[in-house]
């Protein structure tokens, strides 16, 4: 979320695949997880595509999917995980856990004999260390926001080598979901953390063998602009029904592509094994499935959301230069006018070929438990948009150009990530409608990591079309919606809530997480969704369906909207 000059520089170096030999600790794996899937066979190279280069291999500080799509769940794992089909919490590095009667103490029993990919044993010390790092306010991680309970970070302690106890100030419904947090190795990262260098550790120029995890794969090679190669972790702790170690796949080559168009061409040429298909390509792919030896899956609406966000940050570096833009973007009527100018049906038709639904709420469309379907909606109407603009103090000059109360023409720039043709199409549709309202809109695509930098650290933008991954637990958005959140995009990391409605959201998230009964939680999160819909700090667009094309010889796949294709990567194998 790099400017071209930086991107050019990264092409200079190559991190080569390392042939690694480990001095493994002599420990017995006592609690292997055993698959219920069809027994597969070892071997084969899985080839898929990535949209853009990673920014870091440090899972703790990563906040963009170009990085987390490589690390999370593949190199690193949590104490618990969510099943990609049922979405239920399941054991991962912890084999089980106990909860006190008052719901404030959790005791996690770790799997004995699990090893890091370098052969060192995974123990409670690694869990404690990971929490120490997340708690450290000098480490810029969104995970800290999510783990706070009643404004406090949980108390945690090591009971013995394989037992960790965590205490929270009061019952907290999302707590187990928080334990999906990825654990990192103390023996590799303690020294950098102690010396104040943690945030620079495991960057993209790190020797692959230095990056150590418990996941099914390790980093084998990173060649900027070309590929990331993951190799099978020989020390992995999952097994099949015959006791053979997982994963089955030996190598996972992930080709770095510049656009969704390139990804589509790679699959059509038979160079990749599966593809997340754009709606505009789905029917064409379906017609050719038999001859292409692949099958198609429509798993329904994705959990991700796409939206337009405005720069309402008073720390915006261009505020003194262009203060009027801040006035426009903080004008509620202006934002509502833009919301009414969202032609979502055209977006669905042109960008998604009909494979999508309008998004009105910050809760993911498939989340039927917490989705509030009664929030305020802004059906497409340029007439209502004009009414809102008038109410907000705007008018039109003799040339039908929109001007503010000082007679200044409304002009700003909208950007999205280059290569994401769906977002580029949506952005063009929005820009066209706003031009019809008399605004002068400059729009352009930007490389993804550069986009994230503008949004999260430089704060140098007008409006951005971007998206967030979703989920089944609304508290996972506590790094976004509460005013102090690291991803509170329009005005991040506020010391005190900047508005009354933001203060109310802070309160609702606290109450929603503390409530025990689901019915009570729904009430709190319903109100939160209503506030976002009324105040429109972000304006939602449309949600695409999860569409996949998968080669027929890739077995044990169980694709879903929540888990995608790779949620059970350790079980996938190639048939002869």
What are these regions (language model features)?
Residues 1-8:
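Positively charged n-region of N-terminal signal peptides that target proteins for export
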Residues 4, 22-38, 83-85, 104, ...:
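Extracytoplasmic/periplasmic ligand-capture domains
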Residues 8-16:
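Bacterial N-terminal signal peptides
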Residues 28-32, 46-101, 132, 212:
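N-terminal lobe/hinge region of extracytoplasmic solute-binding protein
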Residues 33, 51-69, 93, 120, ...:
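A structural "hinge/loop" feature
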Residues 41, 144-195, 221-223:
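Surface-exposed binding/hinge segments that line
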Residues 106-109, 162-168, 228:
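A generic structural motif
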Residues 541:
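Active-site-proximal polar cores
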């Amino acid at each position: 979320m790099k400017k071209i000059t930086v991107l050019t520089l990264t092409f200079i170096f190559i991190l080569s695949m390392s042939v690694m030999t480990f001095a493994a600790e002599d420990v017995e794996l006592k609690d292997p997880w055993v698959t219920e899937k069809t027994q597969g066979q070892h071997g084969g190279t899985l080839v898929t595509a990535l949209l853009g280069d990673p920014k870091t291999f440090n899972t703790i500080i990563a906040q963009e999917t170009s990085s987390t799509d490589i690390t999370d769940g593949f190199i690193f794992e949590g104490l618990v995980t969510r099943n990609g089909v049922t979405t239920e919490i399941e054991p991962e590095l912890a084999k089980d856990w106990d909860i006190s009667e008052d719901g404030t103490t959790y005791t996690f029993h770790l799997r004995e004999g699990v090893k890091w990919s370098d052969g060192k044993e995974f123990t409670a010390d690694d869990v404690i260390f990971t929490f120490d790092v997340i708690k450290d306010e000098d480490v810029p991680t969104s995970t800290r926001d999510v783990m706070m309970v009643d404004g406090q970070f949980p108390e945690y302690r090591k009971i013995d080598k394989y037992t960790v106890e965590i205490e929270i100030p009061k019952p907290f419904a999302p707590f187990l979901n928080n334990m999906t947090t990825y654990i990192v190795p103390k023996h590799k990262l303690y020294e950098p953390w102690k010396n104040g260098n943690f945030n620079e550790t495991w960057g993209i120029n790190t020797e692959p063998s230095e990056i150590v995890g418990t996941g099914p794969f390790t980093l084998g090679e990173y060649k900027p602009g070309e590929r990331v190669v993951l190799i099978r972790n020989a020390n992995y702790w999952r097994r099949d029904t015959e006791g053979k170690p997982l994963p089955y796949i030996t190598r996972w080559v992930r080709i770095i592509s510049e656009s969704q168009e390139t990804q589509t061409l790679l699959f059509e040429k038979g160079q990749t094994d599966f593809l997340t298909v754009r709606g505009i390509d789905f029917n064409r792919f379906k017609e050719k499935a038999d001859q292409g030896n692949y099958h198609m899956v429509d798993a329904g609406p994705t959990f991700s959301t796409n939206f337009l966000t405005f720069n309402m940050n008073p720390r915006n570096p261009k505020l003194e230069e262009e203060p009027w833009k801040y006035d426009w973007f903080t004008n509620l009527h202006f934002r509502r006018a833009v919301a009414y100018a969202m032609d979502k049906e055209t977006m669905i038709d042109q960008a998604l070929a009909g494979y999508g639904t309008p998004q009105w709420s910050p809760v993911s469309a498939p989340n039927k438990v917490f989705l509030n379907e009664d929030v305020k909606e802004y059906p497409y109407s340029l007439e209502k948009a004009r009414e809102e603009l008038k109410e907000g103090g705007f008018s039109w000059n003799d040339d039908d150009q929109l001007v503010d109360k000082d007679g200044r023409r409304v002009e700003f720039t909208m950007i999205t990530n280059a290569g994401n043709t769906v977002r580029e199409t949506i952005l063009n549709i929005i820009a066209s409608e706003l031009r019809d309202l008399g605004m002068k809109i400059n729009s352009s695509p930007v490389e993804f990591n550069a986009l994230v930098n503008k949004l999260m650290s430089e704060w140098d933008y007008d409006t951005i079309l971007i998206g967030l991954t979703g989920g089944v637990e609304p508290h996972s958005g506590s790094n976004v919606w509460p005013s102090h959140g690291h991803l509170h995009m329009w005005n991040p990391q506020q010391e005190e809530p900047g508005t009354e409605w933001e203060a109310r959201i802070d309160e609702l998230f606290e109450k929603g997480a503390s409530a025990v009964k689901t019915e009570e939680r729904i009430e709190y999160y319903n109100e939160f969704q209503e506030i976002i819909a009324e105040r429109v700090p972000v304006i939602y667009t449309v949600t695409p369906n999860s569409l996949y094309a998968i080669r027929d010889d890739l077995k044990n796949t169980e694709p879903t909207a929540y888990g995608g294709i790779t949620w059970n990567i350790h079980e996938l194998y190639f048939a002869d």
